[in-house]
Each structure stands twice: as C-alpha cells, then as structure tokens.
Amino acid sequence: MQVTETLNEGLKREIKIVVPAKALEEKLNEWLDDTKDKIKLNGFRPGKVPAEYLRKMYGKSFMAEILNEIISDAPRSILADRNERPAMQPQIDIDEDEKILDGRADFVFSLKYEVLPKFEIKDFDHIEIIREIAAVPEKEIDEQVERVLSSTRSYSLKEGLSEEGDCVTIDYLGKLEGVPFEGGADSDAQLILGSKQFIPGFEEQLVDVKAGDTKTISVKFPDNYSAVHLAGRDAEFDITVKAISKPDELKIDDEAAKKVGLESLERLREVVRGQIESQYGSIIRQKIKRQILDALDADYNFEIPEGLLEIEFNNIWAQVNDDLKKAGRSFEDEGVTEKHAREEYRVLAQRRVRLGLVLSEIGMKADVKISEDELKAAVFDQVRQYPGQEKEIMNFFRNTPEAVANLRAPIFEEKVIDHLLSRIKITDKEVTVEELMKEYDESDLTEKKPEKKKGVEKTPIRKKAPKKG
C-alpha cells in the first residue's frame, strides 16, 4: 500500500492511497485458497474445486469484500501512523474501474479530512469569577404560596354582570364561515376571566355578561396557532352563558396546604422556598459558567475545522429560523438584516466550536469520565419530559445508541466546569434578587431568540372546571 500526502494546508489533509494490483491478486488468492475446502459445489468433491473455477464463480464478489475491508481499515491505520485526530469521519473518494474487481488494475482511493487543532492548555490561575448570592424574599414565598393554593379557591354563584376574576360557565359552538368546525364546541365549559386560558380576544368579550345571555363573538386564531387548519382564520363562536360565579376569599392555612398534599402551611412554605432557591441556583450556575467560558474564549484563538463550524452554524441557523417562524416574526421585525444575522450567528458558532474543543482537551487531561449511572440518569431525565410517552421514549433510546451518545456531551461539559471551579478563584457577592435577575437577562447567556407573542399557544376551551393557579 502506497500512501502519499497530496494536501497539507492548515487543518486540511488529503491522502492518496494506492494498493497495487499485485497485492490485490495475492490477497484474492489467499481468500480463494482459504475457502476452497469450505465451498461445496455440485460435481466436485470437497477441496477439489479448481482455483480457476472458484475465481470465475466468486472472484469479483471476493474482491469486492477485500476492497471494503481495505476501505474500512486503512483510514484508521493511516491516521494512527500519522498521529492525527480527524475532526470528522474522513471523506473517501474511490477511483472506480471495473478492472479492479478482476485484479487487473491498482486500487486507488483518497482520504479528505480535517485534523483537530493542536494547542496547549493554559494555566487557570488568572481566572477569577464572581458568584452572586441572593436570599429568597419572604414576599416571593408568599406570592408563590398564594399561586399554589389558588387551586383550592372555591367559587360561589352571583347575580349580575361578570367581571375579571369571575368564573363563567358557558356552552359554545365555533364556526368558520358559518360552518361548525371539529373541536370547536363544548358544553358547561368553565373559564376564569383574565386567566388568558383562551386565544386572544375570546375572554375579553365575556366580561359584562350575565346568566342567560346569548351572544356571538368574533375572534381570529393566531397565525402560528398549533392547529394548522385554524391558524390565521377568522371564526365566530355562538355563546350561551349558563352561570356566573365569583371567587371566594382564598384561605391560606394548614387545611389549604393539606388540599395540595402537604401536612401544613409551614411545610408548604419550606417546599416553595426550596423550589425558588433551586431556580436561583440554576441562574447562578449559568452565570458562573458564562464567566468561565468568556475567560477561556479570551485565552484561545486557534484555527477551527471548517466542517465542525458549518455543522454548528447550520444547527444554530435552523433553530433561529424555527424560533422566528413560531413567533410569527422576521429578521426585519427584529431590526436586523438576514445577512447581518448570519454574520453574528457564525461568530457564535465559531465560539461554540472553539470552546468545545478547549473543554474537551481540558476534560481529557483531567481524566473526566461519565459513569453509566450518570448516563442512565440523563436518559430518565429525557423520558420524564414526555409524560404519557415514557415507554416510547425509552424504547427510542434503547434502539438509538447515537441518541444516548448525544447525552454525553452536556454531561461531560458540566463535569469539566466542575473541575475548573475547583481550580479557579471564586468570590461570593451578595446581591438582590432584582440585581441577580437583571444581570441574568442582560448577560445573554445564549444567543438572543425572538420573543414569542403572548397567548399564541392557547386553545379555545380545554377544561370543564375552572382553571386554578
């Protein structure tokens, strides 16, 4: 096998490989000799099939297997000999020639790939970060407890006109151009006015109605409504108001806490405090991580493989366009041209790829490992995100090894961040919740995404009971 480097520019490599016809012929003869005692053919005793007859019958198929074996093994051995790590699977280009299968021509193919850049990991002594600490205000706990217990609020029938906060019981029939549509009708549906449970414009037209009223309201489904056949359509709903109920005073006590499954109000407050502290902790973690990544980004400026850059950019760009589509917005609405947006997101892609390589190198040198238990926990976390589909999602991961492999990257990254936290200087700083949240919003931890229009995912009526909390 003759191996010749034909390109070495930056990270790009091209290698030409020539396997002489003589070497192929020798390999084929080995295969034929190895199989002559194993093949049974009518008219021949075992082991007595003439070599030329075997070659005529199986020569091309054997040679095809030999070539596949070479293509499978050669890239790995060549890269090992060259002490190179490819950024992606090498591209293999083959010179097709029918004579090769007959053993009458050299087998020529080439490898095209990019190597991972070589760089030295710098010391971390100079990296200093601020860890913000914010105490949970009692007022925030009070407000969250009230939201939780609002599901226990009772309602009492009232006379007179409805107002925001009241629960209205209605029958409704939706129509498109005068024709009822599927899923557009319900009876004894209950709606708390002001809950934004329905599409924009629906609830507002049920303020100032009384029991016994009938009316027809006109609404327009959002352009990005989840039911495609309704998206952007004008519709009318024939409404019959059957009852108006006013909210009773919300009781915040041990009995109310028991209704949501906790033994006391004090225990409920403990749970709520823990949830809020966990939310703060996630924000603090992201801000710490951002500071570390910013510091690493400033430390390294090596060339990155174009193939990895294109993959990362295409993933980001697809997500950006998907977000814009879901939000019913365009680049012009965001005050930026598509060309400028592409440039900005390409810079982000470069940062992500470079930092990914740096974190990977740090993790390798620190011998960061991912245990099977950690991987299983990550799979179960994914499964829990799809209630009602747990079995299907679990089967997906069982049958898709690459999906499980994709879960390794974020786990590995977080473990590398933990390793760095043990090596850098951290200064705690007490801040208010407002300061914590304000800086979190402004820090742009990921690329900015278009804001979604409020209420675009609401459906007309879903429940027969008042929506609580």
From Swiss-Prot:
Provide this UniProt record's keywords sorted from A to Z. Cell cycle, Cell division, Chaperone, Cytoplasm, Isomerase, Rotamase
Q: Which reaction does it catalyse?
A: [protein]-peptidylproline (omega=180) = [protein]-peptidylproline (omega=0)
Q: Which GO terms label this protein's molecular function in UniProt? A: peptidyl-prolyl cis-trans isomerase activity; protein folding chaperone; ribosome binding
The PPIase FKBP-type domain extends over 165-250
Q: Which Pfam families match?
A: FKBP_C (PF00254), Trigger_C (PF05698), Trigger_N (PF05697)
Provide the top EC class.
isomerase
Q: Where is the composition biased (Basic and acidic residues)?
A: 439-460
Region annotated Disordered sits at: 439-469
**Could you say which EC number(s) this protein's record lists?**
5.2.1.8
In the record's own words, the domains note is: Consists of 3 domains; the N-terminus binds the ribosome, the middle domain has PPIase activity, while the C-terminus has intrinsic chaperone activity on its own.
Which PANTHER family does the UniProt entry name for this protein? TRIGGER FACTOR CHAPERONE AND PEPTIDYL-PROLYL CIS/TRANS ISOMERASE, TRIGGER FACTOR-LIKE PROTEIN TIG, CHLOROPLASTIC
Designated name of the protein: Trigger factor
**UniProt organism field:** Bartonella quintana (strain Toulouse) (Rochalimaea quintana)
Instruction: Identify the taxonomic lineage of the organism of origin.
Output: Bacteria, Pseudomonadati, Pseudomonadota, Alphaproteobacteria, Hyphomicrobiales
